Regions:
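Noncatalytic, beta-rich nucleic-acid-contacting surfaces in large DNA/RNA-processing enzymes
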Residues: 1-276
Length: 276
């Protein structure tokens, strides 16, 4: 077992970002728990916490330089946000505001959020956006930004996707949905099987466009658990009735051609099945 977890950690370290999400899902399927980024637990590479648990590395966060990571590793653990922001041994020109912002939005500072904060957005605004220079300023910020509350699920998803380059599939496709897809043999869109015709994906962006004749159509950018981005053209749509939700999983039966790629025709609620 020890050898296995060592191998998994090495595998996750070596896989390129384009295949990282697939590698993480593979590790989960083999019974390993993947813990999120954490200023007190994450290292430079995938860290083994126990025989079944690994934690993501700080190096996956865009905007986190080596010098900022050095400061964290040298002076942790941090039990409170005060210990993190006002540590006389930390060189804050290295662990600067940009690094704090990236750490916080990537969820790596979640353990430092206590009941003084109404949510993660309140915490982020009071500690990173308006970075307090003194302890007194932190108290003032906590009161000042109290109404901020929490980030939305969509904001959290976008932060992780943009800051780490890895789309957090598990935040959108839970284990129950994944089990059903596996049970019925529905592949992700990047593994589309023309004979089966069915696939699933997560919508990241929808753009309205018009043909040369002025007919409206959508271009949906989608992703799946292989971290492959794909475009789907949706023809004959009605903008008043046809809504495709961002960051939600869908099952669909698209057409595929070498010229046009993937496309669907007609009413969205008939061509696209919202999962969950």
């Amino acid at each position: 077992n020890y050898y296995n977890v060592e191998w998994v950690a090495s595998f996750l370290d070596k896989e390129p970002e384009t295949r990282k999400e697939k590698a993480i899902n593979l590790a989960k399927q083999h019974g390993y728990t993947i813990q999120p980024l954490n200023v007190n637990k994450s290292h430079r590479s995938w860290e083994i916490l126990d025989e079944q648990t690994l934690v993501a590395p700080l190096t996956t966060i865009k905007g986190m330089g080596d010098k900022a990571i050095d400061q964290i590793l040298a002076h942790r653990p941090f039990n409170t946000i005060e210990e993190f922001l006002f540590n006389e041994n930390i060189i804050y020109s290295k662990l600067n505001k940009k690094a704090l912002d990236a750490l916080c939005r990537a969820g790596a500072m979640a353990d430092l959020i206590d009941d003084r904060f109404t949510g993660d957005k309140h915490f982020w605004t009071a500690t990173c956006v308006d970075r307090p220079r003194k302890l007194k300023n932190l108290g003032e910020n906590i009161e000042k930004y109290r109404p901020e509350g929490n980030f939305s699920d969509d904001e959290r998803i976008d932060f992780l996707a943009n800051l780490t380059g890895i789309f957090p599939i598990s935040m959108v496709v839970d284990s129950a949905i994944q089990r059903k897809l596996d049970q019925y043999g529905i592949p992700p869109i990047s593994e589309f099987d023309a004979e089966l015709g069915m696939c699933w994906c997560i919508v990241r962006e929808v753009t309205k466009k018009r043909t040369k004749n002025g007919k409206l159509f959508y271009v949906a950018k989608v992703i799946d658990n292989n971290s492959v981005e794909t475009q789907i053209r949706c023809w004959s749509v009605n903008p008043d009735k046809d809504i495709i939700y961002i960051n939600r999983p869908y099952m669909l039966k698209p057409k595929y051609s070498l010229d046009w790629g993937f496309s669907t025709y007609g009413r969205v609620d008939q061509a696209w099945v919202l999962l969950g």
